[in-house]
């Protein structure tokens, strides 16, 4: 284990020994990336790392949120009565149209079924 602060060591232990959510934040240079890499390297949990953009995903050693969960590049409008996506120049997804995007292959389904730790990096 790299040299981690007591707080970082506690966080790492907490992540590995519980199923609780953790929100890690801090200013630049406080060790967030170091802790993230240590979590990835040492966790016994089935882990997936995602990020909102391609560059962030590459830097974190993961994939984009959209590609992991096969999300469309469109705004989601939960109340389908509010908008008709064909009448706008921008693409919208509704409850009735978004389901067509969730056809995952067997491998990706198994990854999600077995997922124990999801790391979302900015």
Sequence positions of predicted segments:
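Conserved ATP-binding/catalytic motifs of P-loop helicase motor domains
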Residues: 1-122
């Amino acid at each position: 284990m790299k040299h981690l602060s007591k707080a970082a060591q506690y966080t790492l232990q907490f992540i590995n020994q519980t199923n609780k959510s953790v929100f890690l934040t801090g200013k630049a240079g406080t060790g967030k990336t170091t802790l993230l890499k240590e979590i990835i390297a040492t966790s016994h949990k089935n882990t997936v790392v995602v990020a909102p953009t391609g560059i962030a995903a590459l830097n974190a050693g993961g994939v984009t949120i959209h590609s992991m969960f096969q999300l469309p590049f469109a705004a989601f409008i939960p109340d389908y009565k509010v908008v008709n996506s064909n009448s706008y120049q921008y693409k919208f997804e509704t409850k009735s149209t978004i389901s067509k995007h969730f056809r995952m292959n067997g491998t990706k389904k198994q990854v999600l079924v077995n997922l124990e730790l999801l790391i979302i990096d900015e």
